[in-house]
Amino acid sequence: MKMIVTGAGRGLGREIVKEAVRRGHEVAAGLRSLDTNMDPLQELKDLASGRLTLLELDVDEEESVLKAKEAMAAKWGALDALVNNAGILLAREQSIEQLEFAAVENTFRTNLLGPMKMVKHFLPLLKNSDNPCILNVSSEAGCFSWAHGRDYPYGLSKAALNFFSAGLRKELSPQGFAVYALHPGWIRTPMGGSEAPGDPADTAQNILDLIEGKIEADAEAWMIDREGKAMPF
């Protein structure tokens, strides 16, 4: 399987890359810059027998996405799985009166427009796969049933990502695509914090199981947890 993972420099993204390589897949690890956060992945690359590509990819910048697409089109020609994992968390616990809208704009640029750019430009490669899968790493924070104040940039961006995922599923599922928004759970990452109960390595295993079909997601679900169970939106 050929797979691209955005936001692969740390946290859940790095664990997904590690697990995918361990399972023998060909993986492109999207990194905003090849000058930072590379050491653990470089060590993995040395052990991956050519199956790991470190790909300079800033999802905030459409030109960067286009360059990455051209590079992988030349290298692979097809793509089986796109994992849109890159995300940011800004201005948490700020009231609406405290909120600066630059934080909202920046969060939407990464958390929503980033995945949209990735899907738009990598779709031709995904269409060359027999079993294409798009997995958008989202959050229950974007579900109306979970909404609370003081989490506006992140929660709103994930709600929009969930809506995008639902629409994309309706558009692409007739063409044989699997499309999901996935809530990974509260896990110990730079975003989730050290107090989180979940291990990102365990979540990465579940994500690979979902992509490989070892875990069957609920048939009509587009918003799922790491076990493939439908989540209320």
Show where each model-derived region lies.
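Structural signature of the Rossmann-like NAD(P)-dependent dehydrogenase/reductase core
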Residues: 5-6, 84-85, 132-139, 178-183
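N-terminal Rossmann NAD(P)H-binding glycine-rich loop of SDR-like oxidoreductase domains
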Residues: 9, 13-18
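Conserved glycine-rich Rossmann-like NAD(P)H-binding loop of the short-chain dehydrogenase/reductase
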Residues: 23-39
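The beta1-alpha1 cofactor-binding region of Rossmann-like NAD(H)/NADP(H)-dependent oxidoreductases
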Residues: 56-67
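Hydrophobic positions on the long internal alpha-helix
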Residues: 83, 118-122, 126, 164-165
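Catalytic loop of short-chain dehydrogenase/reductase
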Residues: 88-108, 127-174
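C-terminal helical subdomain
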Residues: 174, 181-187, 193-233
